[in-house]
Amino acid sequence: MRQDVSKMSEAELAKAEKEIARKYIGGVPWMMVVWGLGNFVVWLTLWPLVMTGVMPLWAGFLVACLNMSLAYLPSHEAQHSNIAKEGHPLRWLNELVGHVSTLPVAYPYSILRITHMLHHAHTNDPEKDPDFNNNAPTWYQSVWHTVESYQPGYVDPYAVILQKREGDPIADRALTEAVLYKLGMVLALITLAWSGYALEAFLLWWLPSKIGIAYLKLCLSWAPHVPFAEQGRYRNTRAWRFFGGMGIWNVLTMGMQYHIVHHLHPAIPLFRNGPAYWEMRDILIARGIPNDGL
């Protein structure tokens, strides 16, 4: 039943929004657990299947691209402790999903968690938001920015922001882990190439990881925050409709059309953001969110 919000005060709107949000918070989001661990297992399975000729390399490449594109969001849930909070008996599972799901893209959970919390705290701040570097007027310029980030000499904004926290043991450890992850990936690729699997290394790991990261930055970072102009809690993220449609289009953007709900209520798991949005939509619009057709 839709609420008439036209005569509600700001305090009443805030109370109604919180009451709706509470209905979608809680429980273990098992879908994200299966997604994160299952996606990693599928990617690992590609290697023996392709190397033994059971699966053609071109098919392995397509699956690997999908694996890389799916690698981040389960870790994202873990970053917010949505699988299990501190002190919960399943906290180990939260951390396992956080670490394992992003192994294919060679990004450590520690650095992703720190920078993502900074993103939430300073969304769209040019100096403090680690994701502000994804700012671009158009989607293809955003993709091009990502391509440029793959070039030699590129300065990673995540590293820059963490280096400013020099002396912080958590930040120092995250930077060390990031170096070890990248070094490990390079050594693994060199070893595979030296062993006669250069094409497999390129098409099952290196190239899919670049494609997946570009897709993730476009859908998870650029699209929900463009034009990156405002910093208010209800103005720094938008609700939007991809190509004017829902259904398959929402799947292709991995639910990011409802990313405004995540920024307002990060304890709501990804797959509940849509239902939560539609229930609180009128309230959010009354509170001034940018709504591009959703």
Feature map (PLM): residue ranges:
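A short, ordered amphipathic alpha-helix with a cationic face
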Residues: P89, E177-A178, W249-V251
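Long helical/loop segments within the catalytic core of UDP-sugar-dependent glycosyltransferases
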Residues: L66, G245-M256
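Non-catalytic, topology-defining segments of multipass membrane proteins
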Residues: M1-C65, P74, H99-L207, P269-L294
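Juxtamembrane helix-capping/reentrant segments at transmembrane boundaries
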Residues: S81-Y107, E127-Q141, Q231-M246
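Histidine-centered catalytic micro-motifs
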Residues: Y72-S81, L112-N124, L220-P227, L252-I268
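Transmembrane alpha-helical segments that form the membrane-embedded catalytic/substrate-channel core
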Residues: L66-A78, P108, W206-G232
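Membrane-helix boundary/juxtamembrane motif in polytopic membrane proteins
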Residues: G167-R173, W206, A229-F243
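Juxtamembrane/interfacial segments around transmembrane helices
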Residues: G87-E95, I114-L118, W144-V155, F228-R238, ...
